[in-house]
């Protein structure tokens, strides 16, 4: 399948043609997307899990019985991953960890003059929510790139949302990162659930 339907050679275009390409018309359309997202957020705030179920069917074409993935399924995800991929995920985890550990900043505590103490202290959030897209390609590397810095920062709880059904690669990457709360919910409804909470999330 050819995804590059239109190829433009920038140097051969005049100014008006260049501006037209840069205008990104999909973002300049009417407010339909913005209005839809606003409605989704309001419905999740007001109707919780019922709204999540409705939007899973509407947007993901998936009827979710249980949003939370059982911990046993997360742990056993390694059974469905080939050894090369497991190895690659573990190497990536090590590399990402090394990179982010090198960025840890020291606490600053100085006395600028007698009786005046100035501090710069870094405190982690208690819990963070991360969203992992799960469309035509499983973006399990995003799990590593989001969860590892949160762990290093000292976040006690990481909650992951991803559209249903969640790919085993995402589950395995989550397991490797120590994520125990995984919910199969996608889109704006997932972000709203993470922000405002529902009966389940």
UniProtKB/Swiss-Prot annotation:
One of its GO terms (cellular component) is cytosol. Catalyzes the sequential NAD-dependent oxidations of L-histidinol to L-histidinaldehyde and then to L-histidine. Homodimer. Its cofactor is Zn(2+). Pathway: Amino-acid biosynthesis; L-histidine biosynthesis; L-histidine from 5-phospho-alpha-D-ribose 1-diphosphate: step 9/9. Keywords: Amino-acid biosynthesis, Histidine biosynthesis, Metal-binding, NAD, Oxidoreductase, Zinc. This is Histidinol dehydrogenase. The keyword Zinc applies. Its EC number is 1.1.1.23. The gene is hisD. It catalyses: L-histidinol + 2 NAD(+) + H2O = L-histidine + 2 NADH + 3 H(+). One of its GO terms (biological process) is L-histidine biosynthetic process. It comes from the Bacteria. Transmembrane segments: none annotated. It holds the Pfam family Histidinol_dh. Belongs to the histidinol dehydrogenase family. Binds 1 zinc ion per subunit. InterPro entries: Ald_DH/histidinol_DH, Hstdl_DH. GO terms for molecular function: histidinol dehydrogenase activity; metal ion binding; NAD binding.
């Amino acid at each position: 399948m050819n995804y590059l339907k239109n190829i433009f050679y920038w140097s051969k275009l005049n100014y008006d043609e260049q501006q037209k390409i840069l205008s990104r018309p999909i973002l300049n359309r009417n407010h339909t997307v913005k209005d839809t997202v606003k409605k989704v957020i309001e419905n999740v705030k007001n109707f919780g899990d019922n709204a999540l179920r409705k939007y899973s069917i509407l947007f993901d074409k998936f009827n979710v019985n249980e949003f939370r993935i059982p911990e046993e399924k997360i742990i056993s995800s390694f059974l469905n991953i080939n050894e090369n991929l497991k190895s690659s995920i573990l190497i990536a985890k090590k590399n990402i960890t090394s990179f982010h550990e090198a960025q840890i900043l020291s606490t600053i505590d100085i006395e600028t003059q007698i009786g005046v103490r100035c501090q710069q202290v870094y405190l982690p959030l208690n819990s963070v929510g991360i969203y992992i897209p799960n469309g035509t390609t499983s973006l399990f590397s995003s799990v590593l790139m989001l969860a590892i810095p949160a762990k290093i920062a000292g976040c006690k709880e990481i909650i992951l949302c991803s559209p249903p059904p969640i790919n085993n690669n995402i589950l395995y990457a989550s397991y490797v990162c120590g994520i125990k709360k995984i919910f199969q919910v996608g889109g704006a409804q997932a972000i709203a659930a993470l922000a405002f909470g529902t009966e389940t999330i």
